[in-house]
UniProtKB/Swiss-Prot annotation:
It comes from the Eukaryota. One of its GO terms (biological process) is negative regulation of gene expression. It is found in: Cytoplasm; Cytoplasm, Cytosol. PROSITE patterns: AA_TRNA_LIGASE_I. Pfam families: Arg_tRNA_synt_N, DALR_1, tRNA-synt_1d. This is Probable arginine--tRNA ligase, cytoplasmic. It comes from Caenorhabditis elegans. A motif ('HIGH' region) lies at residues 252-263. HAMAP family: Arg_tRNA_synth (MF_00123). Forms part of a macromolecular complex that catalyzes the attachment of specific amino acids to cognate tRNAs during protein synthesis. Belongs to the class-I aminoacyl-tRNA synthetase family. The lineage of its organism: Eukaryota, Metazoa, Ecdysozoa, Nematoda, Chromadorea. InterPro entries: aa-tRNA-synth_I_CS (IPR001412), Arg-tRNA-ligase (IPR001278), Arg-tRNA-synth_N (IPR005148), Arg-tRNA-synth_N_sf (IPR036695), ArgRS_core (IPR035684), DALR_anticod-bd (IPR008909), Rossmann-like_a/b/a_fold (IPR014729), tRNAsynth_Ia_anticodon-bd (IPR009080). NCBIfam families: argS. Disulfide bonds: none annotated.
Amino acid sequence: MSANKELQQGYSDYSAASDQAALLNRLITAMQKGELTDELLEHIPELGDAKKLNDKLKYRKSILEKSIAEQAAKNKKNGVKATSTSSPSSSTSAPAEKKAKKDGKTGGAPPKQAKKVDYVTVEDYGSSIFGRLQSLFKKAIEDAFPGLDVPLLLAETPNPQFGDYQCNSAMPIAAKLKANKINKRPGDVAKEIQAKLPTKIDFVEKIDVMPAGFINIFLNTDYLRRQISLLASEGVKLPKLTRKRVLVDFSSPNIAKEMHVGHLRSTIIGDSICRLFEAVGFDVLRVNHIGDWGTQFGMLIAHLYDRFPDFLKKLPDISDLQAFYKESKKRFDEDEQFKKRAYEYVVKLQSHDGDIVKAWNTICDVSKKYNQIVYNYLDIKIKDVGESFYQDKMIELVKWVKTNKPDMLREEDGRQIMFPTGCDIPLTVVKSDGGFTYDTSDLAALKYRMLEEKCDWNIYVVDSGQSLHLETVYAAGRDFGWYDESIQRVEHVAFGLVLGDDKKKFKTRSGETVRLLDLLSEGVKRATEKLIEKGRETAMSEEQLVAARDAVAFGCVKYADLSHTRTQDYVFSFDRMLEDRGNTAVYLLYAYTRIQSIFEKDEVKNVDLVKYIASTPTLPLDHPGEFKLAKQLLKLSDCVLLVLDSLMLHQMCDYVYQLATLFHDFYNECYVIENKEGEKPFVHMHRLALCDVTRKVMSTCFKILGLREVNKM
């Protein structure tokens, strides 16, 4: 029996190796011939992006060459001598045109507005100290120097002898005044700013102005103690903001292809941004712009009919979506009769033929079922609104443009194209055969979201390679008058790549794209091994072990992504993610469970804590460890406002990591429960209250970052 199993395994391994060898052979052949096959583009997605950009640049080149030729003909007719003998592709004799500034970080996207817009409207800063200081100093500077446009320079001070915060705006103001023939020393400018501040600020102890122009701000320690007491009694209250209707477009996998590591960042970052918006009370639309339409569905439907003829009665058990897609593509490439049927099904699908639409729905349902497993693992809530949703809306879009903005369209080689303001690469609105493009679809989506969904903010969480395309679409939306960028926020939240240890795009050992389900399953396996290695299976029930395992497995993957600056690439490493030291999810979860363990002790009674907090409006925080922790706790609102503006989640990760570190320091330096020999354990209630506030603040951060809380680990 054992020999038979080994033989079967050998056959299986041989078959897999043969398939892999055949795949590699096809890829090599395609590269040698210079053919951009679907398989090649799937294994090297950068080629697809490069091809799209190359096609657009080729088009731009042809426009320039035509312009040069026309200008040369005019010059010859008018007797103007050429100033250069360079090739037609040279820009020397080309007519001057407004061109977009190239930017390596945006993939050559046109520059955004020069003046930054504050899209976040704060109605009540709550416990935010930095936010309130910003508001006070902005007004003071405006009152002292009306009409002078200078940025506010306000920051925490690294040295406590210079206070808690420092305003350094006096120096650039003095420089600007000097440029306007007004001579004032920075120290005098600083005094004028101070004079415009309220004489009494409840959270400020004193303000010192230095001769060099530095304004040092010292916080009122009693105010901080009172605020911590309020947090303990009333819970965490984030700043009150003017409510916005926000749409976040994220994740967006293709139907009939399993989610892979390339979808990881958009899914995690997009979900966390949604959680942040929801935490401050915004009305959030979570949109999954799935690729559920296109000519590829013809071959998929034809293959479905052949493989699962009873699909109309029973949802087919397609165990490997990738294999199903590749099988259909292979038949499409090699079988002319199959290809003919596939094209017929495309026409029928576009005509909304009943059975063909059911077949299309079946393929979509199978694919969505797989996607939902990933979303369940990662606690992602999202609504599918795919390409198919915009099919009718693209027709409406073209009619709208031709009726309302006909001058913006021009015909070129049978295509209807447009050049939005500031963009030197066009959008193709209608193809020469009358069909539509991704440009058309994205324009229709933007129009629908701004005019029909009436979104105040429209956030696209898409990789940085799409920056040029998206900024061009946004520019078209502004030209069409769909939104006013001084009021409505339409923004591309770009992110970098996930890399392997070799600093190349993350792949399997065989060079395949890493399936997201496989990646998450590996995380579960490694988290289990880590917990067993620490001997935790003996200290926890089976239910607690599973909860800890999932919190660590999925939390470490999420946090590793979010804790890196999103615009940069990062190296994926389970070993680093599962470290219990440093800026990792495990370290944060360990800090949280340490707090929970304090509240599980027999000496701690929640009813006693509630009574203590109710009778103590000002917590007696005197130890340096207590005070450092308290100050960090009160920075949560400032952190939230910062991330709402930047949409950089690593800033929140930095905040909660610093909080966890300060809590560990506090825990090691300050007894919460003091045990003296022969005496009853003594509970320091003010420190217990500080622990309670810390876990509440950490819990708020965890919810925004999408981490699961655990009581034991």
